[in-house]
Curated annotation (Swiss-Prot):
InterPro entries: COX19. A motif (Cx9C motif 2) lies at residues 52-62. This is Cytochrome c oxidase assembly protein COX19. The gene is COX19. One of its GO terms (cellular component) is mitochondrial intermembrane space. The lineage of its organism: Eukaryota, Fungi, Dikarya, Ascomycota, Saccharomycotina.
Length: 99
């Protein structure tokens, strides 16, 4: 009796996913950014807050800069691509005076 279906002896080789593969940060290059992001997520109780998205962007930028992930457009990652968009996001969460 064989453990392989069809009596095939060839080894099964897993294929990596197209997205979502995150190599470990063994050197701790992005630990600070990761901790700031996780603290923000904890503070807002897991909600997708705009200020946490900006911290996520910093973290992902660090990972891209240190070749821990492939470069990708911010729009593909659902994040603002320039300072104007980032300012618009923070204005959404910053209370205005006089209310």
């Amino acid at each position: 009796m064989s453990a392989n279906p069809g009596n095939s002896l060839k080894a099964l080789s897993p294929t990596p996913p197209e997205r979502g593969s995150f190599p470990l940060d063994h050197d701790g290059d992005c630990t600070k950014q990761m901790q700031e992001y996780l603290s923000c997520i904890k503070l807002v109780k897991g909600e997708n807050a705009p200020n946490c998205r900006l911290l996520a962007k910093e973290y992902l930028k660090c990972r891209m800069d240190n070749k821990l992930m492939d470069r990708d457009d911010w729009k593909h990652l659902g994040l603002p691509s320039d300072k104007k968009e980032a300012n618009d996001v923070t204005k959404e969460t910053t209370p205005t005076s006089g209310q």
